Amino acid sequence: MSGNTFGALFTVTTFGESHGPAIGCVVDGCPPGMSLTEADIQPFLDKRKPGQSKYTTQRREEDKVQILSGVFDGKTTGAPIALLIQNTDQRSRDYEDIKNLFRPGHADFTYHYKYGHRDYRGGGRSSARETAARVAAGAIARLYLKRYLNLDIIGYLQQMGDLKLQFENENEINKNPFFCPNNKQTQELADYIDRLRRQGDSVGARVKILARGVPTGLGDPVFDKLDATLAYAMMSINAVKGVEIGAGFNAVEQLGSYHRDQMTAKGFLSNHAGGILGGIATGQPIEVSIALKPTSSITTPGQTINTEGEEVTVVTKGRHDPCVGIRAVPIAEAMMALVLMDHYLRHKAQCK
């Protein structure tokens, strides 16, 4: 199975399955000399880990990270950094009933027909459990970008189902279990999740990610555009079905006289481009929005087929998120960091 490595100079290779003994990653290309401990990485994993509130999956994982290599005396050596996260709360028995079935909307069908042999427990390699390794790797990138470039990345829930969230206060984002920038709407979100659980259903979401302090010039033309890499990175996240940069699809209805980001001696007058022109960073905040589908792991019975091609009814058991968009916030932040870190190293290698 290929497709497990991301990046050109700052590369991340993830490994492991949802119900295997552990997941992890190998980060290669991290510059030497950066202070790094497990305690530096852990807060980022704590934002993503399951079982923290009743509004997400009740699978409870500590997600304690171990640094196995690439760090000596508290500093990176330039060697590959291996990170390991133990799986401790698997309940594989929940999946016995569906080991020969294809859950609608999941990768069961495609993995089976591509590889002929799949790990059905919790989705195996296709599970969002894999993203914990991305968050751990992204933490290293974020720490470097913050310390050496003063670059900040922040993500938040922009919409859940038909409930649109008004951006009120950035400081409120990490003070509630929804990564909501408006504390006045958190009760609406809680009620929404409770209603979905009672109905045995799920809903999609929209997440926004901002990067501030991005140096002008990051990115390359044509095929390696910064926005092209960001779209590629975001689309690799489980359940993501759409990506917008800046104004995104709203640009369809905008006039050129409005959409163009006019410039003055003091800077740009708007940021409809989302901080990127010609695939290269303008120095403005980079703005990315992603759309996530509703998970198909629901208790409402549905039609499917089994490995013999016979029509059957399936009910998904196990512990799942009514809205996967909530925990997608730290994952999307991590992917933004990995892209920017990689492009920063590529920029340094080519330009002064």
Swiss-Prot record:
Reduced FMN (FMNH(2)). PROSITE patterns: CHORISMATE_SYNTHASE_1 (PS00787), CHORISMATE_SYNTHASE_2 (PS00788), CHORISMATE_SYNTHASE_3 (PS00789). Its EC number is 4.2.3.5. Pathway: Metabolic intermediate biosynthesis; chorismate biosynthesis; chorismate from D-erythrose 4-phosphate and phosphoenolpyruvate: step 7/7. Keywords: Amino-acid biosynthesis, Aromatic amino acid biosynthesis, FAD, Flavoprotein, FMN, Lyase, NADP. NADP(+) binds at R48. Its cofactor is FMNH2. It comes from the Bacteria. Homotetramer. This reaction introduces a second double bond into the aromatic ring system. Belongs to the chorismate synthase family. This is Chorismate synthase. It comes from Legionella pneumophila (strain Paris). The lineage of its organism: Bacteria, Pseudomonadati, Pseudomonadota, Gammaproteobacteria, Legionellales.
